[in-house]
Amino acid sequence: MLDPIAIQLGPLAIRWYALCIVTGLILAVYLTMKEAPRKKIIPDDILDFILVAFPLAILGARLYYVIFRFDYYSQNLGEIFAIWNGGLAIYGGLITGALVLYIFADRKLINTWDFLDIAAPSVMIAQSLGRWGNFFNQEAYGATVDNLDYLPGFIRDQMYIEGSYRQPTFLYESLWNLLGFALILIFRRKWKSLRRGHITAFYLIWYGFGRMVIEGMRTDSLMFFGLRVSQWLSVVFIGLGIMIVIYQNRKKAPYYITEEEK
């Protein structure tokens, strides 16, 4: 089993979980700022947004996690803020981040679709890296399996939990997001009929579908009417993505807008 603590500086422990999230954030900010000028967005506005959105998204992710496990946290109030032990629900962070983005874009007079389009691939790569925090914490895993011989030894050993090998669902989602990120880069360069909002829609559909399938492999999720809560949200994401495609195809606004068209 790998030590979840990456660096120990006296009483201060820096965990791999935090490093994975911060690394994903830094890469996401870099990629978003690089793409921003092509969408007529000032890169400094991206930094201003991150300074507001990131802590609120972390809070939203934690709040979502605690709410759906309130039976436990109501008896362990001291653990509610112990995010260093894990327990950040991605959907909570995404919903909070999207709300902050909408408000921020409105106040900065930035087209919301443009902001969402440049944020979507960056969020996807950040999620891909962030899932490795679950790996180090030995959480967000799936059902027991006989063996994991197809995986590298360090992953196989870390997925040996409570006397059994577990499905490395963190890895499946990480790779799924990485593939989605690569496809977005290809679409942006090669898809001539790409419309404003299409990248956002692709993210919602791609991530929603992958999460719905992978979530079905997990054993630690809350059930609601026969599906896990995250699977229901995945259905909502897919539905929103499809509606965005239909709506934006009618608008016919190209992905990159010139000043004259804007």
From Swiss-Prot:
It is an enzyme of class 2 (transferase). Its EC number is 2.5.1.145. The chain crosses the membrane at residues 9-29, 41-61, 80-100, 109-129, 167-187, 197-217, 226-246. A 1,2-diacyl-sn-glycero-3-phospho-(1'-sn-glycerol) binds at R131. It is found in: Cell membrane. Its main location: membrane. The keyword Manganese does not apply. PROSITE patterns: LGT. One of its GO terms (cellular component) is plasma membrane. It is a multi-pass membrane protein. Keywords: Cell membrane, Membrane, Transferase, Transmembrane, Transmembrane helix. Pfam families: LGT (PF01790). GO terms for molecular function: phosphatidylglycerol-prolipoprotein diacylglyceryl transferase activity. Catalyzes the transfer of the diacylglyceryl group from phosphatidylglycerol to the sulfhydryl group of the N-terminal cysteine of a prolipoprotein, the first step in the formation of mature lipoproteins. Belongs to the Lgt family. This is Phosphatidylglycerol--prolipoprotein diacylglyceryl transferase. It comes from Streptococcus pneumoniae (strain ATCC 700669 / Spain 23F-1). The lineage of its organism: Bacteria, Bacillati, Bacillota, Bacilli, Lactobacillales.
